[in-house]
Each structure stands twice: as C-alpha cells, then as structure tokens.
A protein has these predicted regions:
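Core segments of cupin and vicinal oxygen chelate
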Residues: 1, 8-52
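N-terminal beta-strand motif that seeds the catalytic metal site of vicinal oxygen chelate
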Residues: 1-19, 73-78, 125-131
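A general marker of short, structured functional hotspots
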Residues: 2-3, 16-17, 21, 34, ...
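Short hydrophobic-acidic sequence motifs that mark active-site Asp/Glu residues
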Residues: 6, 54, 120
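Vicinal oxygen chelate
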Residues: 9, 23, 30-32, 87-131
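Conserved, structured core segments of small domains
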Residues: 14, 25, 42-79, 84, ...
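Conserved hydrophobic/aromatic beta-strand scaffold that supports enzyme active sites
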Residues: 38-40, 77, 110-112
C-alpha cells in the first residue's frame, strides 16, 4: 500500500502562514530552498516517535479559492489533545471555523477550519466517548 509521506501548504503571505501554524500548533519552518522560496513544515521534533508527516510551505502560484467554494485538494487533519483549546488558538491567530466541531460517535471530535491563507484543514481529538 502507498502512504502519504509529505504535504504542502500554499500561501499568499508566507510569513503570515508561518506565524499562524507556529502559534496554533507549534510547528517550525526551516528554509529549504532560496529559489523558488520553499520552507519545510516540521510538525514534530526530528527524532520523535509520534506518527505523522512533515511538509513544505510555498508561495501560492494562483488565486486562492473564494469563500464558500469547494476545496480542490486533499485536506490534512491535525490530531490534538484538546479540540476547544485549539479552536480558541486558531481564532486568535486569525483562522476561521469552516465546519464546527461534531462527534464521530465512539471515536473522536472533528471539525474544519480556514487558515489565514484560505486553506482548509481539519482538527481531530480522539475520544471514545464522543457522541
């Protein structure tokens, strides 16, 4: 079976995107390339045993989707310890709720957000008591 091993975030304003994801999730952004500008997106420490993947950040090559337009991309979902706490961080950092928190019964809490660049991403809090 083939696995996802990398993701990319496109941004109109790269500094704003790095600040958003750094403030909300604590991610780090080492510069990988000068031209075209490309940053890594480190979602865990280098030797972490946590499951997950790292990605990249690049300049958006075309206009962002308009509000209300469907997403024409894969959506990455971030596992968190406390959904409500992360929601507050997202909103404080300039993100918006795209689909409010809902239960995946017996499994988790799930919801979707827009970052400062208009990208959709999910948030997932495991909870076997969710209903």
């Amino acid at each position: 079976m083939n696995r996802v091993v990398h993701f990319e975030i496109q941004a109109e304003n790269l500094e704003r995107a790095m600040k958003f994801y750094g403030d909300v999730f604590g991610w780090q952004f080492p510069k990988w390339m000068e031209e075209p500008p490309y940053w890594g997106v480190m979602t865990a420490e280098k030797d972490s045993k946590e499951p997950g993947i790292n990605g990249g950040l690049l300049q958006r090559p075309c206009p962002a989707p308009t509000i209300g337009q469907g997403t024409n991309a894969f959506i990455c979902t971030v596992q968190v310890e406390n959904f409500d706490e992360i929601t507050k961080k997202i909103e404080t950092a300039g993100g918006k709720v795209a689909m409010p928190k809902f239960a995946l019964p017996g499994m988790a809490w799930q919801g979707y957000f827009l970052d400062t660049e208009g990208n959709t991403f999910g948030v997932h809090q495991a909870d076997k008591n969710a209903k």
